Amino acid sequence: MITITEHYTPMFRRGYRMQFEKTQDCHVILYPEGMAKLNDSATFILQLVDGERTIANIIDELNERFPEAGGVNDDVKDFFAQAHAQKWITFREPA
């Protein structure tokens, strides 16, 4: 599995997108071979993926939005490693 650094900028892989699916009553990742249902945590993280924010920016925003979580740094990095392994996400490294 890839080692995630906070300086990476996550982006949805070409052909993959997130949307709310009424019939599933949740957000999903749509991709050429099908779809994956997302839980609330995955949805909050992926809603911040815009190809501009770094993982550090996403972590900061989630820590600010959910202070009661006590820090989401490792959880967010673990999630992005899994999303990358599932081929939902690619990363741009800093120049």
Curated annotation (Swiss-Prot):
Domain of life the protein comes from: Bacteria
Pathway participation: Cofactor biosynthesis; pyrroloquinoline quinone biosynthesis
Any one GO molecular-function label of the UniProt entry: quinone binding
Alphabetically ordered keywords of this record: PQQ biosynthesis
UniProt cross-references to NCBIfam families, sorted A to Z: PQQ_PqqD, PRK02079.1
Family from the record: Belongs to the PqqD family.
Alphabetized HAMAP family for the sequence: PQQ_syn_PqqD
Assembly notes: Monomer. Interacts with PqqE.
The protein, known as: PqqA binding protein
Provenance organism: Rahnella aquatilis
Organism taxonomic ancestry: Bacteria, Pseudomonadati, Pseudomonadota, Gammaproteobacteria, Enterobacterales
Gene name per UniProt: pqqD
